[in-house]
Amino acid sequence: KPLNGEVIANVQGKNHKGVGYLPQQTQAQKDFPASVWEVVLSGVLNNDHRCPFYNKKDKAEAEKNMEKLNILDLKKRCYRELSGGQQQRVLLARALCATDSVLILDEPVTGLDPAASMELYETIKDLNKKENVTIIMVSHDIKNALNYATHILHLEQEKDFFGTVEEYKKSNVSNMFLGGVAND
């Protein structure tokens, strides 16, 4: 049961981009009847976009993020015709259009096959390491997420934990949750 709270972002300057968000996939999203281009481009609307039309800068940003995620060749395809992994890459490109610093990912690999999951984890790792994007990920896929994380925030009743992956693997919380698997 959620309690309450707030998130305060360190927003600096007029041109600061906000936080990008990749929601957990729903059936409604999977059936969305827009082109890949339209979905990705809609991400710039989070950036204090007051004009009802997209400008050259918006389009260049969308194209850059599509290239970064290797989906430029899908530009004209209908979003709902894509595989689950491709759809997640499209939504990740859209989220990147909204930020250059922080991404919040909600269960990003849910519903993906193992190969697509690992590919998405590698993409997320590259965004963090090469693009210096902070990643905050909510996941039940702890065993795989541990391989890509630097820190873990585990919230469970009165067994909360925050620390490095190594500290987590040695903790009682990890042993209870993973049955010692993380310590192998």
Question: Where are the predicted features?
Answer:
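H-loop (His-switch) and adjacent beta-strand-loop-beta switch element
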Residues: I152-V165
